Curated annotation (Swiss-Prot):
Organism: Macaca fascicularis
GO CC list: axoneme; cilium; microtubule; microtubule cytoskeleton
Gene name, Swiss-Prot/TrEMBL: TTLL10
SUPFAM superfamilies associated with the record: Glutathione synthetase ATP-binding domain-like
Disulfide topology: none
Compositionally biased spans, kind Pro residues: 539-557
Lineage: Eukaryota, Metazoa, Chordata, Craniata, Vertebrata
Location of this chain's protein in the cell: Cytoplasm, Cytoskeleton; Cell projection, Cilium; Cytoplasm, Cytoskeleton, Cilium axoneme
Protein's recorded name: Protein polyglycylase TTLL10
Boundaries of every TTL domain copy: 82-479
Biased composition (Low complexity): 57-74
Residues reported in the UniProt entry to bind Mg(2+) 1: 425, 438
Family annotation (InterPro entries): TTL/TTLL_fam, TTLL10
Amino acid sequence: MGSSQEEGLPCQPSQPDHDTGGHGGPDLEGAGRVSTTPGPPGLLTSHPPADSDDTDATGPPAALLEGLLLGDGKPSPHSTRPGPFFYIGGNNGAAIISSYCKSKGWRRIQDSRREDYVLKWCEVKSRDSYGSFREGEQLLYQLPNNKLLTTKIGLLSTLRGRAWAMSKASKAPGGTQARLGKDATAPTLEDLPWTSPGHLRPQRVLRMEEFFPETYRLDLKHEREAFFTLFDETQIWICKPTASNQGKGIFLLRNQEEVAALQAKTRRAEDDPIHHKSPFRGPQARVVQRYIQNPLLLDGRKFDVRSYLLIACTTPYMIFFSHGYARLTLSLYDPHSSDLSGHLTNQFMQKKSPLYVLLKEDTVWSMERLNRYINTTFWKARGLPKDWVFTTLTKRMQQIMAHCFLAAKSKLECKLGYFDLIGCDFLIDDNFKVWLLEMNSNPALHTNCEVLKEVIPGVVIETLDLALETFQKSLRGQKMLPLLSQRRFVLLHNGEADVWPRLGGSCSLRRRLPPPTRQAKSSGPPTPRAPDQPGTRRPVPPPLAPQRPQLPGPSPDPDSAHDGQPQAPGTGDRHPEQEPSPGTAKEEREEPENARPWGGHPRPTPHAPATLPAFRDL
């Protein structure tokens, strides 16, 4: 999960979360498909491919980006310099991304210090990249503080914070909905039932312990002492560094001797004076997590499922789900084995086996193949619904991913141009219960087997398409839906109905915001207004928090807005894998206690010349 690097600190390039062994250069497989995938009209597709892979010429990215985005793909007539430019740091998916950008006439630059790019995709987050980022003019991959979701401790703390907030709200008079001002009749994602073998039960609140294994932090004394006290040899626990990937630094705890050794090691580290003087030189923080000893097996082998959470836009939030693939071990599962390759499914671990060269195609299954196997092997024997993978499993993964995002939403840094693709790993136990293992920044985008060649390029291309289209619509002040570039991704959360400003946001663009979903009562009907036309500008009082860009238009109907409800394109003829998950997450319409609605005051018009000087001068 995640990366071991701290932002702004000298470090080696991070590795994708798995599947990098043996890769010394850019992955060329699958890259040829990029140019054949049509993008939506007007999304930077009119340029012929550039011949050069690098250039030393410079050009104003704001003018170029506005000319391309707002001029339906045509370069700005005010700029005669080469460009626009893109930068890729690292090899993970570089060939696919580069081919995509070149097909739009963009030119690749190799100097990471240059600031005249329109797209920057890096494996390693850099403080300088965020410091020089020009909001509304550039696209930058990875949210600055995505570690809230993509490190072990970050995700654990985020989920605990959500659980605490929901517990506190539920104790208020009238329950959670009364405290949070909810419409008790509105359908919610977590009000609807979900299917498990043999029974159907309502799931009113998604509780952390139902999808996330019991976990303790070893960097906190009271938590590690609690773990050392409760451990017994009937259990297996797995110890993980908080920010490593590829299975590095992971080991199992199965007996008192191993736990005693870990206890002594943590005490030595705590007593080390260097650790107290310089926390950066201390050992990396770790967690211990209850190991799921009864995983569902495919022909006797352990597997997990990689899915994707896409944050295509942060102003407003546009959050999507996409299927990925199943990852299997080469060896048969033995809970007592000390060989980690039988416990960890990622490709980096499987490549260590001498059998990998011969059997690598059988270590990655498509979701369609997994669905066929479940139908054939377990459908009738375990009383599962038909196509369990594309119905129950899909909906459950969407529920969990939406819950995790909502838990972090108010704390994530959001600027127009930030986007992120996060790999989410799920394990299914032999009772068909779905567990979230971890969420990964910089998910592996290599295509070293046939299934990955079919899955990865499509995921990357649609990620970039959706990031560009949502950026364009937010910049123009247009409504987000429908999205012409949405194909396989399923919409989990449409933030157009969110109450602004958000906590944790740092957006400086000042554009018109829609009224909040819950409006104050008035004696007369609201004044009608064309959906894409700004209202009359009047003086605005000083905001209580930084103003956030959002789209113009009338107040969204809470019964029809897609706030948290997965929406797939072409719902009239939907593949089972695009089955939307039910309802809107109950917490999704929450707002932090100190986040205030605009209270009826008019908001700024869509254009803000003072904050976009390059656009003003055109």
